[in-house]
Amino acid sequence: MEGPTHPKPFKDKTFSWDLIILVGVVRVLLRLDVGMANPSPHQVYNVTWVITNVQTNSQANATSMLGTLTDAYPTLHVDLCDLVGDTWEPIVLDPSNVKHGARYSSSKYGCKTTDRKKQQQTYPFYVCPGHAPSMGPKGTHCGGAHDGFCAAWGCETTGEAWWKPTSSWDYITVKRGSSQDTSCDKNCNPLVLQFTQKGRQASWDGPKLWGLRLYRTGYDPIALFSVSRQVSTIMPPQAMGPNLVLPEQKPPSRQSQTKSKVATQKPQTNGTTPRSVAPATMSPKRIGTRDRLINLVQGTYLALNATDPNKTKDCWLCLVSRPPYYEGIAILGNYSNQTNPPPSCLSTPQHKLTISEVSGQGLCIGTVPRTHQALCNKTQQGHTGAHYLAAPNGTYWACNTGLTPCISMAVLNWTSDFCVLIELWPRVTYHQPEYIYTHFDKAVRFRREPISLTVALMLGGLTVGGIAAGVGTGTKALLETAQFRQLQIAMHTDIQALEESISALEKSLTSLSEVVLQNRRGLDILFLQGGGLCAALKEECCFYADHTGLVRDNMAKLRERLKQRQQLFDSQQGWFEGWFNKSPWFTTLISSIMGPLLILLLILLFGPCILNRLVQFVKDRISVVQALILTQQYQQIQQYDPDRP
């Protein structure tokens, strides 16, 4: 039952339906912003592609996968009968609206019986897009849903027909697949839907509509279907309770509260076998900001003490209170290359994290600009295809788009981005004990500016570099110590808390504005004489809870220890050294006149002796000269010995 040769007359392609109401079809699919305006392109989501039968508003196929918004474009499989349903059956279609004398009672297409399913395998089909009617051929009207968006030839962009319809701008290609079911008891008309390059670059905020038509003698039946994308996070965040910013600013918990308590069962004396009791699972307790800061410093100390105990005998570790709070050290490491998203890709923070300070030289992936080539000791161009590069444990990829534990090569190749493998360290500076004491010393002498070192420079490369160094020296066990892992957990907890605080602070702006407006209204009724401000406003009073008492107590104890140390210094100081602490100009005066005084003293001590020796030397030289002058006036007489012959 093959139709006439292409093209068929325009009138053969006309089918008058009542206008299909697409209210149930064009469903509003909310775009997932994942809690921020610009999510990281390497963020892995649960992406579901849904193919919907438009006429019946039923789901024909749903395919889910884990991936980024750039590479999560799988090959979709759907059966033609799932797209058609019962819409091609004679009992459903209205013969009164059918033109040119076609009668559906004698039609051999549809999915009602097994014979019709088999017959449908012989019909070619073509697909016309309805999401962009303006992209059709010039001077051609492709019609609407009642025409399947194929009112004229040239509107088709894909399909399985002898003239091989193609397009350079449509989002999908639809071809016929192979079926193993020869009896057609179930589905035997598989279709394969693949995304084109234009489809991978398109915005899928809402469903896209297409029309599919069979190529046969007479009227070509229509099937409308839509393709939509649904994006969801792996573990959607949950918020509970009131404002999460201010109430959690509590003092540090005591040391005894951090220890885990394990309940032990009393031994049984009746000889029966003790039953295993499942431990009760309790929800993790939310720690405060001060606990997180203390954990960062404590974890840094334990890691430094494990690597170099001599440096922790007497030192100060100071947590930097101004941005940047973290710094990255570029390292060389072996990353894992996987085709499926590893578990580390599924726990990416919702907010972008930017590292403003990266030092050292390490491994770089992608196209590195000249401005950042100094960070690269080894550069790799990456891999082709949909691969995921997971950083080693305790390390991250620092990219143009932010910090991420793993990167997608599809995103990296598409955006021309580059990444550097780094270790993440908190901004904790290392100082000698004298540095802190000088800030509380009352002496007026100006000391030289001390040199501050961050712990990251002292411990840089511990995660990956320590492995290579530990093979021959036996220090690899350092990487598995609880001290280093505690520092990593403390940094991860602090980053997670920072992320939650940013979201909660945004929600707290409303509460802050209410307090400001309340104060403004209080100024308007300044002369109110009864009831006070809160009673006049008939609102709850706002108070400020001051928790700085603990800080004042700690500073008082610190000043007391400094005072005792200063007294110890004074008791060991000599009387001459105490002169320099009397007055600020005394040190300058002594240093100015000390040189001339020493020269004058040396002249007075050794001058007479040197002068006497010089006078004596001159006298001796004069005597020698006088003797020479006198001998020049006389001649020596030759002596004669008479005894000699």
Curated annotation (Swiss-Prot):
SUPFAM superfamilies: ENV polyprotein, receptor-binding domain (SSF49830), Virus ectodomain (SSF58069)
Superkingdom classification of source: Viruses
Disulphide linkage map: C128-C150, C142-C155, C315-C318, C315-C542, C534-C541
Polar residues bias (residue ranges): 252-275
Record key words, sorted: Cleavage on pair of basic residues, Coiled coil, Disulfide bond, Fusion of virus membrane with host cell membrane, Fusion of virus membrane with host membrane, Glycoprotein, Host cell membrane, Host membrane, Host-virus interaction, Lipoprotein, Membrane, Palmitate, Signal, Transmembrane, Transmembrane helix, Viral attachment to host cell, Viral envelope protein, Viral penetration into host cytoplasm, Virion, Virus entry into host cell
Extracellular side: 37-589
Motif range (CX6CC): 534-542
Coiled-coil intervals, chain numbering: 479-528, 538-574
Chain segments carrying region Disordered: 238-283
Comment, domains: The 17 amino acids long immunosuppressive region is present in many retroviral envelope proteins. Synthetic peptides derived from this relatively conserved sequence inhibit immune function in vitro and in vivo.
Subunit structure: The mature envelope protein (Env) consists of a trimer of SU-TM heterodimers attached by a labile interchain disulfide bond.
Name this protein carries in UniProt: Envelope glycoprotein
Taxonomic placement: Viruses, Riboviria, Pararnavirae, Artverviricota, Revtraviricetes
